[in-house]
């Protein structure tokens, strides 16, 4: 499994909607870039100026909403992930 460093997290991105609410099937070119996913791994935290480590507010298993064009897309063992900083996460979905 991937282990992110510092204040980074690894997210398994949730798939974009295939249909609109009215049932119209969307072609790939019309789909919005997904902005939510499930956290599968978290880093050890951000190092502050005084040298102490601040733990992350998110945890493995959290479903989050993140900025649209943030992070780096990677494929690991056939699965697509997104690695991004905690500051790119906008909200936790409960």
Swiss-Prot record:
> Signal sequence: where?
none
Which GO annotations describe the biological process of this protein?
A: chaperone cofactor-dependent protein refolding
Q: Which GO terms describe its cellular component?
A: cytoplasm
Q: Which UniProt keywords apply?
A: Chaperone, Cytoplasm
Q: Name one GO molecular function term.
A: ATP binding
Give its localization: Cytoplasm
Q: Which Pfam families match?
A: Cpn10 (PF00166)
Q: Which InterPro entries match?
A: Chaperonin_GroES, Chaperonin_GroES_sf, Chaprnonin_Cpn10_CS, GroES-like_sf
Q: Any idea what job this protein has?
A: Together with the chaperonin GroEL, plays an essential role in assisting protein folding. The GroEL-GroES system forms a nano-cage that allows encapsulation of the non-native substrate proteins and provides a physical environment optimized to promote and accelerate protein folding. GroES binds to the apical surface of the GroEL ring, thereby capping the opening of the GroEL channel.
- Tell me, how does this one assemble? Heptamer of 7 subunits arranged in a ring. Interacts with the chaperonin GroEL.
* Family, as annotated: Belongs to the GroES chaperonin family.
The name this protein carries in UniProt is: Co-chaperonin GroES
What organism does the UniProt record list as the source?
A: Listeria innocua serovar 6a (strain ATCC BAA-680 / CLIP 11262)
Q: What is the lineage of its organism?
A: Bacteria, Bacillati, Bacillota, Bacilli, Bacillales
Q: Which gene encodes it?
A: groES
């Amino acid at each position: 499994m991937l282990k992110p460093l510092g204040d980074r997290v690894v997210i398994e991105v949730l798939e974009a909607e295939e249909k609109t609410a009215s049932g119209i099937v969307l072609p790939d070119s019309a789909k919005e870039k997904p902005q939510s996913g499930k956290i599968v791994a978290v880093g050890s935290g951000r190092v502050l100026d005084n040298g102490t480590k601040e733990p992350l507010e998110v945890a493995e298993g959290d479903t989050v909403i993140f900025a649209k064009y943030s992070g780096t897309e990677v494929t690991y063992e056939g699965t697509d992930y997104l690695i991004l900083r905690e500051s790119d996460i906008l909200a936790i979905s409960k």
